[in-house]
A protein has these predicted regions:
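Compositionally biased terminal segments of proteins
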Residues: 1-152
Length: 152
């Protein structure tokens, strides 16, 4: 994962923000890596978490302009940092899934020296179906079958 992505995830973690990786990087975590031009980070849209996200963005050095806590509490904010292939998208909402419902179903992955949450498989599927764009439907076709551990 590129250095800027790791630095952003580190800043969010250090600030105590609640967030989940979604999009193509989540697809990779579920076993189907594909090329992408960005890192999609879904943040919990609450006032308390919004303050943490803003602190993380400031620590990262993001150009905040007029981004506010209220923006991060709305369910339709997309805040973009940089340009592809290193763009970071901070999302306050995604299609078809509620953050608080998805949080306990997340999977934890190890990236650099961090443990971060990734949207769980069923929520990933629900999001891609709800978004319905051709690339989202293709992601569903790329998603491998669920892995079962012996004894499950």
């Amino acid at each position: 994962m590129n250095h800027d992505f790791v630095e952003m995830l580190s800043a969010l973690s250090a600030a105590g923000a609640r967030f989940l990786i979604v999009g193509a990087h989540a697809l990779a975590a579920h076993g189907a890596p594909r090329a992408t031009g960005d890192l999609d980070i879904w943040v919990q849209p609450t006032r308390q978490n919004a303050g943490r996200v803003l602190a993380a963005l400031q620590a990262f050095g993001a150009p905040l302009f007029d981004l506010t806590e209220a923006d991060l509490c709305a369910h339709d904010t997309v805040f973009q940092i940089g340009l592809p292939p290193s763009r970071i998208d901070i999302l306050s909402g995604i299609s078809g899934v509620d953050f608080d419902a998805a949080w306990p179903r997340r999977i934890d992955v190890h990236i650099a020296d961090l443990h971060v949450g990734v949207i769980g498989r069923e929520d990933f599927i629900a999001n891609k179906r709800a978004a319905g764009r051709p690339k989202d439907l293709l992601d569903l076709q790329l998603l491998p079958p669920p892995r079962h551990l012996p004894g499950e």
